[in-house]
Amino acid sequence: MSKAYEQSGVNIHAGYEAVERMSSHVKRTMRKEVIGGLGGFGATFDLSQLNMTAPVLVSGTDGVGTKLKLAIDYGKHDSIGIDAVAMCVNDILTTGAEPLYFLDYIATNKVVPEVIEQIVKGISDACVETNTALIGGETAEMGEMYHEGEYDVAGFAVGAVEKDDYVDSSEVKEGQVVIGLASSGIHSNGYSLVRKLINESGIDLASNFDNRPFIDVFLEPTKLYVKPVLALKKEVSIKAMNHITGGGFYENIPRALPAGYAARIDTTSFPTPKIFDWLQQQGNIDTNEMYNIFNMGIGYTVIVDEKDASRALKILAEQNVEAYQIGHIMKNESTAIELLGV
């Protein structure tokens, strides 16, 4: 690397150190289908080892959003990596796909090896939990694009599902049951509003809320639903699924419904984490609007036949996931979702 390039603000030695620090974390995520190692121009994955007859690839990309600002301000960088993976793999999971591999993109004002390592550790932890190989990535130092200490994180996930097992909305019918899987908290959406309310409240984020520091509550990583949902899919016919992200219930649940059908959701059938009550009170936000912004305690939904509902709840409980029968499917030409109890 030329001195001229270093004089322009790019610290190549810090980049080398970051790669060295992250390599042990990345190695933990490897699957037998991965061909070769790190450092190539392109990452390779052998689909023939999946033992699928007609595999369909499913891809998704996402970022963490302004939740990053809280992590940066308070120097807690590891959980953000979990968020980056969860936002991608939970999305592709809605098709019934098993996540196969993940690639990350980290852009920053200046490469700080210790910070990059923390981010990649979180990414790797989530990849290990979901059996997803971290097979590539990019760390870009762009001093003119970001303020000092700032960075952005995004990810890209690819999964596969047998063509005959692909989950869409084609089998959704009247009378089927909506099961909600509990969220771990706010997850990774609505943080522009969250940060506004934090600033207006003047709270000390080191102070306790519900027996935990506020900052830990706000940075609680997005829950990974891959293992429990794939375990459920092996035992029960799933008709449709939703990842409750930006837009809350109102924008996400209708995405899994065919025209002419609606989900009737009883909001009293599941507990709402206390942090949502705090946000609502702090911002004087209408309850309907809360359900149009946040997950309100339900991070993922599955639709099953009524006869399978009890069994599905039992399987999810065995997977250590809190789940609730939160509603049912009905015919409705005028709306795709009804919320009771708001």
From Swiss-Prot:
Xref: InterPro entries: PurM-like_C_dom, PurM-like_C_sf, PurM-like_N, PurM-like_N_sf, PurM_cligase
Subcellular location(s) per record: Cytoplasm
Residues forming coiled coils: none
Biological-process GO terms, alphabetical: 'de novo' IMP biosynthetic process; adenine biosynthetic process
Pathway the protein takes part in: Purine metabolism; IMP biosynthesis via de novo pathway; 5-amino-1-(5-phospho-D-ribosyl)imidazole from N(2)-formyl-N(1)-(5-phospho-D-ribosyl)glycinamide: step 2/2
Disulfide bonds: none
CDD domains per record: PurM
Organism domain of life: Bacteria
GO cellular component, one term: cytosol
Reaction equations catalysed: 2-formamido-N(1)-(5-O-phospho-beta-D-ribosyl)acetamidine + ATP = 5-amino-1-(5-phospho-beta-D-ribosyl)imidazole + ADP + phosphate + H(+)
Assigned keywords, A-Z: ATP-binding, Cytoplasm, Ligase, Nucleotide-binding, Purine biosynthesis
EC number: 6.3.3.1
NCBIfam families referenced in this protein's UniProt entry, alphabetically: purM
Protein name: Phosphoribosylformylglycinamidine cyclo-ligase
Species whose genome carries this gene: Staphylococcus aureus (strain MSSA476)
